Amino acid sequence: NVRPVFANLAFTQAISPFLMFDYAAPREFSATEEKRGVGPHPHRGFETVTIAFQGEVEHGDSVGHRGVIGPGDVQWMTAASGIVHEEFLSRDFLKQGGVLEMAQLWVNLPASYKMTAPKYQPILSRDIPVVALPENGGTVRVIAGNYAGTQGAASTYSPVMLWDIKLTAGKEVELVVPEGYSAMLFVR
């Protein structure tokens, strides 16, 4: 039940360098031995950013990178000059079953970096800085870029900021987006 939030060329030009955003709403998976996910497929010239909210996703690619991300973790894969990769629900997750919820964002690379070597960054939740919002308004997990002077965990080629924000019910907050940046908000 993955649904595209956006993949429209006119819209993505307005929020460059973002190319596409997919969201897999929470879904219960029964325990199984059967592999579930997406088999080998190629990418080139951009980065895929996968955020696991619930469940576990396993990554493998043609360059030899392997990794598993779980709740709160992020996988930042730079396809750059070209990579073939696959993503499946992790073996442990499949054995026990459970709820999967995740999102994937595609980020265009600047022309000068499109032919660099592929790269893989598994970013664990515990390594993502968290900033408290004023007046107990909530928290900001700084995945990439910065927020309020706190640098995010991901190394990026494009000047992007990716924040995972949890707001406190009934509170009002103001988020400052630097001049020259576009902003997009996704509520789940």
Question: Positions of the model-derived regions?
Answer:
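Generic beta-strand structural signal
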Residues: 47, 67, 73-75, 85, ...
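A short glycine-rich, His/Asp/Glu-containing loop-to-beta-strand
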Residues: 1-53, 131-174
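Conserved double-stranded beta-helix
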Residues: 17-24, 73-84, 111
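Ligand-binding loop in jelly-roll beta-barrel domains
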Residues: 79-113
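"Short basic amphipathic alpha-helical interaction patches in structured regions
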Residues: 63-70, 89-92, 119-122
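Long amphipathic alpha-helical segments that form oligomerization/scaffold cores
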Residues: 107-140
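Short, structured patches in soluble enzyme cores that scaffold and shape functional sites
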Residues: 104-111, 124, 142-146, 166-169, ...
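Glycine- and acidic-residue-biased ligand/ion/polar-headgroup-sensing regions
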Residues: 44-64, 70-74, 80-84, 169-171, ...
